[in-house]
Amino acid sequence: ISGKNDGVIKPRIEKDKAAQELRSREKAEVFTPSWVCNVQNNLVDDAWFGISRRRFNTEKQDGWKTNYYPISFAETKGRTWKDYVRATRMEVSCGEAPYLTTRYDTVTGKYIPVRCRVGLLDRKLRVILENVSNGEEWIEWALIAVQNIYGYDWQGDNVLLARENILYSVIESFHDAFDMMLDKE
């Protein structure tokens, strides 16, 4: 939304406190800090991998330390990185979709570098990068990853922000990996 309607829809962190409180009271809208999303997403991965081991990061109080080594699929009983990317994930009441992609902390507004993100899509994009050999193949698998994550929200502005965050996360991840921008197609 641009022109005279610029700023009508904006992330929660850019709204004044009164507007945030009103949305919380009237719509039961709350926003989860990224470190909490990470803890819960780690539990999702523990269930998928079948073992409790922090593959993507190590949890710290109110944060995490990214593990930069490649994600191993050796202990997944025959499942591969492709199965991980194809695994369906859904965030109900997604708001700005911090469980799917953590481009910024929804509470503080702090930008999170691509390689340190903890969303479910972010993890899939990382796994793709670790297992493909070129940008064309990355795009093919990134599309599959996006097709297998879902966000639902009652508030239309949140749905728009969630979609925007998913799109930008893919664009930023591609740029970070290949030091070039995606084609418009």
Regions found by a protein language model. Give the residues of each.
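SAM-dependent methyltransferase catalytic region
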Residues: I1-E185
